């Protein structure tokens, strides 16, 4: 079984100020510190404003943590504007699930971070010379409970050498894309 390098990212999308689905930055760092218990290599993309928090994690918990500081909101202003316009179009059409409260419908920064997950993985592969043969994305705030960390402190799985996505719903033969977007239906994750 191959070793797996974990890639993740954390960017301030203002979530602590959201009316719905709000969480503060400290919550995410608590989750990430649990992830850092793993012996796997971890590469994180983030903003320079979080350098003190990452420096503390490196000095106290995970000395081999690799942090790549990249200001994605600055370098992707045009894309953020396009996302914002698309979200406004959806809102104007109406009929969004949960009255349009999910961030997919109104937070362009949320969409951008999710959109860039494959970019972060590829960028880690290109930039880090001692990366493992297998790379996996795990969300920065995924490890909410200690029981999610294996006793061995090593996350392994016998993947073959392909990109893996998980179907969480069967995809129908005929799919109305607009309805899927309006209902925020997720068929694939990975």
List the model feature ranges, each with a label.
Residues 1-27:
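N-proximal low-complexity "stem/linker" segments adjacent to membrane-targeting elements
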Residues 60-129:
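Active-site-proximal specificity loops/subdomain of glycosyltransferases
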């Amino acid at each position: 079984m191959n070793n797996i390098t974990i890639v993740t990212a954390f960017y301030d999308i203002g979530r602590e100020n959201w009316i719905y689905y709000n969480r503060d930055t400290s919550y995410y760092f608590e989750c990430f510190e649990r992830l850092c218990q793993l012996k796997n290599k971890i590469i994180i993309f983030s903003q320079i404003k979080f350098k003190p928090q990452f420096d503390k994690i490196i000095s106290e918990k995970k000395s081999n943590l690799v942090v790549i500081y990249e200001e994605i909101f600055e370098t992707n202003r045009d894309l953020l504007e396009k996302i914002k316009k698309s979200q406004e179009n959806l809102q104007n059409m109406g009929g969004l699930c949960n009255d349009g409260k999910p961030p997919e419908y109104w937070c362009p920064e949320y969409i951008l971070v999710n959109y860039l997950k494959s970019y972060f993985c590829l960028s880690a592969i290109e930039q880090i010379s001692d990366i493992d043969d297998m790379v996996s994305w795990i969300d920065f705030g995924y490890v909410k409970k200690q029981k999610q960390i294996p006793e061995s402190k090593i996350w392994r799985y016998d993947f073959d050498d392909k990109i893996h996505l998980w179907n969480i719903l069967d995809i129908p033969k005929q799919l109305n894309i607009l309805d899927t977007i309006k209902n925020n239906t997720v068929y694939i994750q990975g």
